[in-house]
Amino acid sequence: MLVPLPVAAPPAPPAVPVLLAEGRLALAFRRGEGRFPSGDPIWWLELRRNGSTVVRWPAASGIASRQAADRRWSPGNAAPLPPGLYRLGRPEAWAGSYWIDLSPRFPTSRSALGIHTCLPGSGCICLPNAADTAAVAGWIRRAGITQLTVLN
């Protein structure tokens, strides 16, 4: 059973002018530096406008010991998400938080991928803090964000 662990307090919300700025919002996911206390590498889920990060949330993807595993063709191996473009599903209430379905827009045998609250990591995007998952779900709904790019 995956049990959420607390992490540092979420970042302060962006200033109102940033939220009202012109430009399309997009979600990107990238490998960061450092590790959670669980040993999972830190990744960043970033809300971007015109290529600049507006806000970001710490996340995990894949379990710590499977970071170098095949990311595209081995379902169930707990590797991080493969790089590429994903279609985002509508956020759904799930296990006291949210599930946001991820559908790869490229050939892969991976399935049942999503964004949800968990830590240690799984083969999904795991946000350790339910408040962060709720914030991401809110942005997706309000801004009509329909895709995510996994950068690395």
Placement of each model-derived feature along the sequence:
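Cell wall/extracellular polymer interaction/catalysis modules
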Residues: 2-119, 134-145, 151-152
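Active-site nucleophilic cysteine motif
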Residues: 121-129, 133
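Structural signal for conserved beta-strand scaffold positions within catalytic alpha/beta enzyme cores
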Residues: 126, 149-150
